[in-house]
A protein has these predicted regions:
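Phosphate/diphosphate-binding loops
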Residues: 1-46, 127-174
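Short, Lys/Arg- and Gly-enriched loop/turn segments at beta-strand edges
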Residues: 47-54
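Gly-rich Lys/Arg/Thr-decorated short loops/hinges at beta-loop-alpha junctions or inter-strand turns
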Residues: 54-66
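Short, surface-exposed amphipathic charged segments that create phosphate/polyanion-binding patches used
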Residues: 134-136, 180-184
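Beta-strand->loop->alpha-helix junctions that form or flank phosphate-binding loops
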Residues: 96-97, 108, 114-126, 157-182
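Active-site-proximal betaalpha loop/short-helix elements
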Residues: 66-141
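Conserved small/polar residues in nucleotide/adenosyl-binding loops
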Residues: 186-191
Length: 191
């Protein structure tokens, strides 16, 4: 691509798209928050897998474990999630990928329906982590942040029984992103 300042080269990028038949359009949901006072569930494990992440690049971290993907485990997790979705238990959902949980929560809140309060001590993990940056910015694969109406919380938890799933927060009326981890608290500045 040529500009006045010279050429701009786009790095080679692998893109994989999937297509399928939507049997029931009522099962199609968006990624924007739907209402305040709803609950936020994280499905999938968050591990200390910061290698190659946006956080690592931004902070000059050159080592760190690169996220590993367990396709078989993720498929079973997604089947349980799909069952909850098609049962009408999910208001909205967003995959957690580049930028981690913090970026995903912020993207969901862009709808203007409210803010997000997260309790990082509730984030599902197998091996834990030493830094509060990990649950916020890890790019562990296979995870989804799911908005659920409190009325359907018990049903959603039943649908996800046996899988890594925890209520890690809620949607607030105040348009802020707040994350707590033990005694640490971070609140985004007012808009």
């Amino acid at each position: 691509f040529e500009t006045e300042d010279g050429p701009i080269n786009v790095p080679v990028t692998f893109l994989c798209s999937g297509f399928g038949v939507v049997e029931n359009p009522d099962h199609v949901i968006g990624s924007s928050l739907r209402r305040s006072n709803s609950l936020l569930y994280l499905i999938g494990h968050t591990e200390d897998e910061m290698g190659g992440s946006v956080f690592a690049r931004t902070h000059g971290v050159e080592d760190g474990k690169v996220p590993q993907t367990d396709c078989a485990a993720n498929m079973e997790l997604y089947k349980a999630y799909y069952s909850a979705l098609t049962s009408g238990l999910v208001l909205s959902a967003h995959d957690i990928s580049e930028g981690g949980l913090a970026v995903t929560a912020a993207e969901m809140a862009f709808s203007g329906k409210g803010g997000v309060r997260l309790d990082l001590t509730k984030v599902p993990t197998v091996n834990g982590w030493k830094s509060p940056a990990v649950p916020l910015f890890s790019e562990s694969t296979g995870r989804i942040l799911v908005e659920v109406d409190p009325e359907f919380a018990a049903d959603f938890e039943t649908a996800m029984d046996g899988f890594p799933c925890a209520c890690i927060g809620s949607v607030t009326e105040e348009k802020r992103l707040t994350a707590t981890c033990c005694c640490l608290l971070y609140t985004s500045p007012s808009p």
